[in-house]
Amino acid sequence: MSPYLAAEDLSMFGTDPWWLVVIKAVFCFAFLMVTVLFSIVWERKVVAWMQLRIGPNRHGPWGMLQSLADGIKLMLKEDVIVKRADKAVYVLAPIVAAIPAFMAIAVIPFGPAGNEVSIFGHRTAMQLTDLPIAMLFILAVASVGIYGIVLAGWSSGSTYPLLGGLRSCAQMISYEIAMGAAFASVFLYSGSMSTSEIVAQQDDRWYIVLLPVSFILYIVTMVGETNRAPFDMPESEGDLVGGFNTEYSSIKFAMFMLAEYVNMVTVSAVATTLFLGGWRAPWPISTFWEGANHGWWPLLWFVVKVQLLLFFFIWLRGTLPRVRYDQLMKLGWKVLIPVSLVWLMLVATVRALRNENYGFSDIALYIGGGVLVLLLLSFLVDMYRDKGGKAADQPAETGTGTGTGTETAFDPMAGGFPVPPMPGQQVPPVPRRRPRRERELIVSGGPDTHSDGPAGGPTDGKEASDG
């Protein structure tokens, strides 16, 4: 071993023997895979019930092995590589998308930080490793997964995957800003970026009660990060066929699907850790039963909370329609990011006042006064904005200034593209190719040009059939 490496303090990575670390790593991988297999079947069952269907019921008891059968089927299919694809990047893209999805689970605690469980005679914590900057690690590996999606769209050599990859990149980058602000508010309030320490700080009250705005922000951003309905614009079948993975098949397509569902499990585990008390038992159980947070019981509470959040994903898919791309970007940049920044400043102010030993009543008074001032300023800005808008719209209502009193014609392209049809709007029809007899000929050359044709009538078969 290098003397420089031996001199470093590696205790933050744990003191478990290497074989125990391997066992815990295999457990984390198996936990993700089993949860994904169950979540796929559960999603198909729940959506089928919501749509008054039966759902999968052929493979295994109650169709529980359907996702396993689908995975085997995909692996046995022909692996087609597009002729115009950049083969090296085309093959690496699913791997780049799948590997970061598994990495974040390494710092998620499944149980108390103390040595609570025994594995082959060794006392160990139910966590693979913990880092002083665990939250930054989660945010970093979530960002790396974007590269796999973008490279998949770019290397496919097709227009639709490229558009899907660009959409996904813009969407995930936009929503990661608000997600990072939600993370920052949590470790500002708790005073630590360690996941196990954040769970320990929720001994009295969960952060869903103390930081409700951060929880709502994270719930919205985690749906956008995973490209799930109603934010599944990168996979929009109506305009992108299948999205960034249109040209993929066999095991490569399965890896993209695996990465999507593993990301769902990972973000649900992160939400459980940050806002729902992590491995802690719910309030009534932990109050009347002290042993609920010891032994292997914390693993049960953690899994139940993760499954509830996965059901939230499924419920969104079966309930809400897909939003437009401009609405998606507007929500991210004009709503989530400003709200997250304002909320982050409020949380930082509360933290500073707590460090100065201010009481709860003083903090509530200062924060309440600041919120009232912000609301008053926003009201004044909206009021002056409405006045300016009415003054600008008045000439359009009275006419063009010529005294005729006619209304200005509505330009459907005035606000940019796309512009949805407004109530009462009359959009001019798309020009079509009309028969020669109904067209007005415009002489732009000699009489014997190909567009004019002979005087006797049309020359091409299409125009003859139109006539």
From Swiss-Prot:
Signal peptide: none
Compartment(s): Cell membrane
EC number: 7.1.1.-
Pfam families on file: NADHdh (PF00146)
Protein keywords: Cell membrane, Membrane, NAD, Quinone, Translocase, Transmembrane, Transmembrane helix, Ubiquinone
Membrane topology: Multi-pass membrane protein
Self-association state and partner proteins as the record states: NDH-1 is composed of 14 different subunits. Subunits NuoA, H, J, K, L, M, N constitute the membrane sector of the complex.
Family membership: Belongs to the complex I subunit 1 family.
Entry-linked HAMAP family: NDH1_NuoH (MF_01350)
Protein name: NADH-quinone oxidoreductase subunit H
Lineage of the organism: Bacteria, Bacillati, Actinomycetota, Actinomycetes, Kitasatosporales
